[in-house]
Amino acid sequence: MNTGRGVGRVVVLSGPSAVGKSTVVRCLRERIPDLYFSVSATTRAPRPGEVDGVDYSFVTPEAFQQLIDDGALLEWAEIHGGLHRSGTPARPVREATVAGRPVLIEVDLAGARAVKQAMPEALSVFLAPPSWEVLERRLVGRGTETPDVMSRRLDTARTELAAQSDFDVVVVNSQLESACSELVSLLVGHTSAGTNPA
């Protein structure tokens, strides 16, 4: 049902591992009650504290392949050199935008490019660290990956940082509150089909 607000704004959020995407997303969900947060399907194992259907939809590789075969994903990609796959279910995103809700899609770099290609009206936002040193410290401090996986994540982060100019907006996550406020403005301050102020 359309709320009369026009089509909801779609913001595609990306950035390197450990830049604080999950923390920023939690802040946005608290500050924007009507926000539709796209829950990605993934074949990776849950991290401590992650909830199936809330943080991600954790699926088997076979179930993920079926989603691809059915054309049910807006985008999908192999992550960190093929360690796992992740993708965005298309139908819930489209339903939320038609209902006039702001939509947040958190994806990796390849996913952001694919969503932007499929939905050119979406606003792509890169969440950047204050510096490489801060990002490296955050990644290593997590302690959730093996040294080999950590090396891959650092390589991926370098690639992603180099591509931030491909995004519509770059938000530096030096302080949570300012990063969250900037993203709130982007999500609720714009609609792709709203009234034009006189």
UniProtKB/Swiss-Prot annotation:
- Annotated keywords: ATP-binding, Cytoplasm, Kinase, Nucleotide-binding, Transferase
For this record, an example GO cellular component is: cytosol
Q: Where in the cell is it found?
A: Cytoplasm
Domain Guanylate kinase-like, chain residue ranges per copy: 8-188
Instruction: Cite the GO molecular-function annotations of the record.
Output: ATP binding; guanylate kinase activity
Instruction: List positions binding ATP.
Output: 15-22
Q: Which SMART domains match?
A: GuKc
| Function noted in UniProt | Essential for recycling GMP and indirectly, cGMP.
Instruction: Provide the family line.
Output: Belongs to the guanylate kinase family.
**HAMAP family given for it?**
Guanylate_kinase
**Name of the protein in question:** Guanylate kinase
User: In which organism is this protein found?
Assistant: Mycobacterium sp. (strain MCS)
